[in-house]
C-alpha cells in the first residue's frame, strides 16, 4: 500500500511511524509545508495516557517522551492580587518541536520518506491519503462537501504566546482590564519555558498583556511565534473518510484548548487508524472501523470542551475558594472524573 500523509504535525508523524512499524504501508511519504525544525507553537499538553499510546509498540519511545515532559499535579488561580491552589489530576507538557523531532527520527528509522512544500490536494496514485494537515486542512477543504465539514466559533478571542520562565504548574491568571477580565492559561513545558495563552477583548498587543500579567510573570518576557488573535473553531465532519482519503487529528475534529486534549486526540487517532488498517484487509472496512472507534470519544471530548469554553466566556467574579471550585468543575457542569478521563481516551460510563 502506498500511503501519503499530508501534514507533519503530531498526528501525521505518529501515524506514519505506526504504519511503517506495522508493515501495512509499502511506501509511506509525509508531506509538510514546513521544513525540519521549522514549526510553530510552544508547549503541548501530554497527559500520561497520551504517552502510553506508544508503550506497547515502542516502549523506549514512551520512556524518551517522558524524559522530556514537565509534569505537575496542582492548579492555581491568581486574581485580585491573591493566589490559591488545589491538587489536580497529574498532567504534563513538552516542547512541540521536541515531540516532532523525536517522532520524525523514528519515522526516518523505519524508512518513511519526507517531502516539503505546499500540500497538494490532488490524490496522485496513492492507495491511501491521510489528511493530517490541521484545522485549516487543505486536503479536507478541497473535499468539504464529501466530508460534510462544519465549523463554529466557541469561547472568547485568544492568542498563543510563550514565556521565558517555567511556571510552577498549571495556572489560570486573571487580570482586570477596562474591557473586562483577561485570562491567561499558563503551564510549564521545559526547565525555562511556559505556554502562555491569553483570552481578552480588544486584541491588545503582547506588550500590553505583559503589563497586565507582570506580577505573576515575575519579570519573564512574553514570546511570540506566529502568534495572532483569533476565535477557536470547533470542527465537525459528517464522515471522516471519502474514498481513499481519511481525516485524523485537527483535520477531523477540534476540541476547545481549555481542556488540553488536542495532542492526545491526535496521537490516539494515529494509533487507531494504524491498528484499523492492520485489522481489516479492505480499506473501506478499515476506515469505517477507525471512525467507529474514535467518534464517540471525540464527540464526548468536544462536549466537555464546549462547556469549558462557555464557562471561561462568562468568568464569574466570586471569592477565590469558590472560583477554584468553579474552575475545577467549570461551574458544576463537569467533574474531576471527567477531566481525569480526558487523559485516558475513554468515554465515562454514567451511573
UniProtKB/Swiss-Prot annotation:
Keywords: Antibiotic biosynthesis, FAD, Flavoprotein, Monooxygenase, NAD, Oxidoreductase
Gene Ontology MF: a single term: NAD+ binding
Enzyme Commission code(s) on record: 1.14.13.223
Catalytic activity: 3-hydroxy-4-methylanthranilyl-[aryl-carrier protein] + NADH + O2 + H(+) = 3,5-dihydroxy-4-methylanthranilyl-[aryl-carrier protein] + NAD(+) + H2O
Pathway: Antibiotic biosynthesis
Alphabetical list of InterPro entries matching this protein: FAD-bd, FAD/NAD-bd_sf, PheA/TfdB_FAD_monoxygenase
Example GO BP: antibiotic biosynthetic process
SUPFAM superfamilies according to UniProt: FAD/NAD(P)-binding domain
Cofactor dependency: FAD
Purpose of the protein: Involved in the biosynthesis of the antitumor antibiotic sibiromycin. Hydroxylates the C5 position of the peptidyl carrier protein (PCP)-bound 4-methyl-3-hydroxyanthranilic acid (4-MHA or 3H4MAA), leading to the formation of the fully substituted anthranilate moiety found in sibiromycin.
Name this polypeptide is given: 3-hydroxy-4-methyl-anthranilyl-[aryl-carrier protein] 5-monooxygenase
Organism annotation: Streptosporangium sibiricum
Amino acid at each position: 500500500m502506498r500511503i501519503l500523509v499530508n501534514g507533519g504535525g503530531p498526528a501525521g508523524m505518529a501515524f506514519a511511524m505506526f504504519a511503517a512499524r506495522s508493515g501495512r504501508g509499502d511506501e509511506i511519504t509525509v508531506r509538510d509545508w514546513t521544513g525540519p525544525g521549522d514549526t510553530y507553537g510552544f508547549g503541548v499538553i501530554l497527559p500520561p495516557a497520551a504517552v502510553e499510546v506508544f508503550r506497547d509498540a515502542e516502549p523506549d519511545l514512551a520512556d524518551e517522551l517522558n524524559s522530556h515532559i514537565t509534569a505537575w499535579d496542582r492548579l492555581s488561580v491568581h486574581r485580585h492580587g491573591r493566589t490559591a491552589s488545589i491538587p489536580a489530576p497529574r498532567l504534563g507538557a513538552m516542547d512541540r518541536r521536541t515531540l516532532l523531532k523525536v517522532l520524525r527520527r523514528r519515522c526516518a528509522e523505519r524508512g518513511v520518506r519526507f517531502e516539503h512544500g505546499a500540500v497538494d490536494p490532488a490524490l496522485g496514485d496513492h492507495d491511501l491519503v491521510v489528511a493530517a494537515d490541521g484545522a485549516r486542512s487543505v486536503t479536507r477543504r478541497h473535499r468539504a462537501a464529501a466530508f460534510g465539514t462544519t465549523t463554529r466559533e466557541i469561547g472568547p478571542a485568544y492568542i498563543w504566546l510563550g514565556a521565558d520562565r517555567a511556571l510552577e504548574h498549571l495556572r489560570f491568571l486573571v487580570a482586570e482590564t477596562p474591557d473586562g477580565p483577561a485570562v491567561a492559561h499558563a503551564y510549564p513545558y521545559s526547565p525555562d519555558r511556559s505556554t502562555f495563552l491569553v483570552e481578552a477583548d480588544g486584541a491588545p498587543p503582547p506588550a500590553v498583556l505583559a503589563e497586565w500579567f507582570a506580577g505573576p510573570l515575575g519579570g519573564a518576557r512574553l514570546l511570540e511565534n506566529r502568534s495572532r488573535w483569533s476565535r477557536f473553531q470547533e470542527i465537525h465532519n459528517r464522515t471522516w473518510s471519502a474514498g481513499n482519503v481519511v481525516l485524523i487529528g485537527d483535520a477531523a475534529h477540534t476540541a476547545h484548548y481549555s481542556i488540553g486534549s488536542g495532542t492526545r486526540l491526535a496521537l490516539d487517532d494515529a494509533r487507531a487508524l494504524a491498528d484499523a488498517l492492520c485489522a481489516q484487509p479492505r480499506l473501506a472496512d478499515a476506515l469505517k472501523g477507525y471512525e467507529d472507534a474514535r467518534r464517540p470519544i471525540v464527540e464526548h471530548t468536544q462536549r466537555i470542551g464546549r462547556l469549558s469554553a462557555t464557562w471561561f466566556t462568562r468568568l464569574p467574579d466570586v471569592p477565590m475558594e469558590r472560583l477554584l471550585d468553579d474552575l475545577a468543575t467549570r461551574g458544576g457542569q463537569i467533574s474531576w472524573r471527567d477531566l481525569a478521563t480526558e487523559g485516558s481516551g475513554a468515554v465515562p460510563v454514567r451511573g
